[in-house]
């Protein structure tokens, strides 16, 4: 247990705040022991890699962080494999582990920051793949020390959302996540950017796809170790068919992705760019010059600086397109 613990290394935005108390654990029994000892005082917050958080001030409570590790094969057939992964495993380390063993499914999620537990909370996704389509079950322990295993059908998954993000489940801590991966060669290569990059290689393999995804992300997204950020700051809005057609008539060059016959997803980054924000700064916070969906800490920014920029960007998009874009990042 550490008092007045700096959270600078526990949030990828690089916001310099502290927690009144910081507790780490490496097993379910350790977590249960911390809970039973009474050291987890309210308010409390469980964090992963801090890649989806924006701290707005010092946290006057207890921060919990998992170091539960391990990747265990729990079921296997000729076609697929189920692995149980500790919530504290770094997400990209897990992706690399799978690629090296020729397990298909997570390669498009390469280089996403954060940890495995948070992947199940956030329903991370990229390049046509969402983690909900790979998850089998999520194991948890609550603040009363009770374990519960959620089947994927109980997790309430939707775009960047799950029941674990609900306020009433704040006291539920993810301990393990089980994933089903394919042993048969299978890729999701629907995005034009991926297909264009793959043309540089003589053939498609898991390792090649991972390298391509990493190259694309590194070109568009800043390294949080160099420039603080939380990746995509805003969610891509989903609009109804009628609103989409009206916008398309006005902006025929607008990119879009069909969700179903009634709903269409519009890239928030494109709208932000159209509003002239790409590369623009507001104090020490800025919109990244290569990917307008990303807000960055140019150095010394506080949470309030990032929120002020976020509010200004949202107001511009609302005024120009009549669409509200919402932060993907959680404000603390």
Curated annotation (Swiss-Prot):
Residues in the signal sequence: none
UniProt-listed SUPFAM superfamilies: FAD-binding/transporter-associated domain-like (SSF56176), Uridine diphospho-N-Acetylenolpyruvylglucosamine reductase, MurB, C-terminal domain (SSF56194)
Domain FAD-binding PCMH-type intervals: 15-184
E.C. numbers: 1.3.1.98
Keyword list, A-Z: Cell cycle, Cell division, Cell shape, Cell wall biogenesis/degradation, Cytoplasm, FAD, Flavoprotein, NADP, Oxidoreductase, Peptidoglycan synthesis
Active site: 160, 232 (proton donor), 328
Functional pathway: Cell wall biogenesis; peptidoglycan biosynthesis
InterPro entries on file: FAD-bd_PCMH (IPR016166), FAD-bd_PCMH-like_sf (IPR036318), FAD-bd_PCMH_sub1 (IPR016167), FAD-bd_PCMH_sub2 (IPR016169), MurB (IPR003170), MurB_C (IPR011601), MurB_C_sf (IPR036635), Oxid_FAD_bind_N (IPR006094)
One of the Pfam families matching this protein, by short name: FAD_binding_4
Record-annotated membrane-spanning stretches: none
Top class in the EC scheme: oxidoreductase
GO CC, alphabetical: cytosol
Subcellular location: Cytoplasm
Any one GO biological process: cell wall organization
Catalytic activity as recorded in UniProt: UDP-N-acetyl-alpha-D-muramate + NADP(+) = UDP-N-acetyl-3-O-(1-carboxyvinyl)-alpha-D-glucosamine + NADPH + H(+)
Any one Gene Ontology molecular-function term assigned to this protein's record: FAD binding
Cofactor(s) listed in the protein's UniProt record: FAD
Task of the protein: Cell wall formation.
Family, as annotated: Belongs to the MurB family.
Entry protein name: UDP-N-acetylenolpyruvoylglucosamine reductase
Native species: Bacteroides fragilis (strain YCH46)
């Amino acid at each position: 247990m550490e008092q007045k613990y700096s959270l600078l290394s526990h949030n990828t935005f690089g916001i310099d705040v502290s927690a009144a108390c910081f507790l780490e654990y490496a097993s379910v029994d350790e977590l249960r022991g911390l809970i039973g000892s009474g050291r987890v005082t309210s308010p409390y917050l469980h964090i992963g890699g801090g890649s989806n958080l924006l701290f707005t001030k010092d946290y006057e409570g207890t921060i919990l962080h998992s170091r539960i590790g391990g990747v265990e094969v729990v079921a296997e057939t000729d076609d697929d494999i189920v692995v149980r992964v500790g919530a504290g495993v770094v997400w990209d380390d897990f992706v690399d582990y799978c690629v090296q063993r020729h397990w298909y499914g997570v390669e498009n999620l390469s280089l996403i920051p954060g940890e495995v537990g948070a992947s199940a909370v956030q329903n991370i996704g990229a390049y046509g793949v969402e983690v909900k389509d790979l998850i089998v079950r999520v194991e948890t322990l609550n603040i009363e020390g009770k374990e519960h295993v959620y089947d994927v059908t109980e997790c309430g998954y939707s775009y960047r959302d799950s029941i674990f993000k609900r306020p009433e489940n704040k006291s539920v801590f993810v301990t393990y996540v089980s994933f089903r991966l394919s042993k048969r060669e299978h890729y999701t290569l629907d995005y034009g950017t991926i297909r264009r990059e793959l043309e540089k290689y003589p053939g498609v393999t898991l390792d090649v796809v991972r390298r391509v995804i990493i190259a694309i992300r590194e070109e568009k997204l800043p390294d949080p170790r160099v420039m603080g950020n939380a990746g995509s700051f805003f969610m891509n809005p989903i609009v109804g068919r009628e609103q989409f057609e009206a916008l398309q008539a006005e902006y025929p060059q607008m990119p879009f992705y069909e969700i179903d016959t009634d709903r269409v997803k519009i890239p928030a980054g494109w709208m932000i760019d159209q509003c002239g924000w790409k590369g623009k700064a507001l104090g020490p916070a800025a919109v990244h010059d290569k990917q307008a969906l990303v807000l960055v800490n140019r150095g010394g920014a506080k949470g309030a600086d990032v929120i002020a920029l976020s509010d200004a960007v949202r107001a511009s998009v609302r005024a120009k397109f009549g669409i509200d874009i919402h932060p993907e990042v959680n404000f603390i």
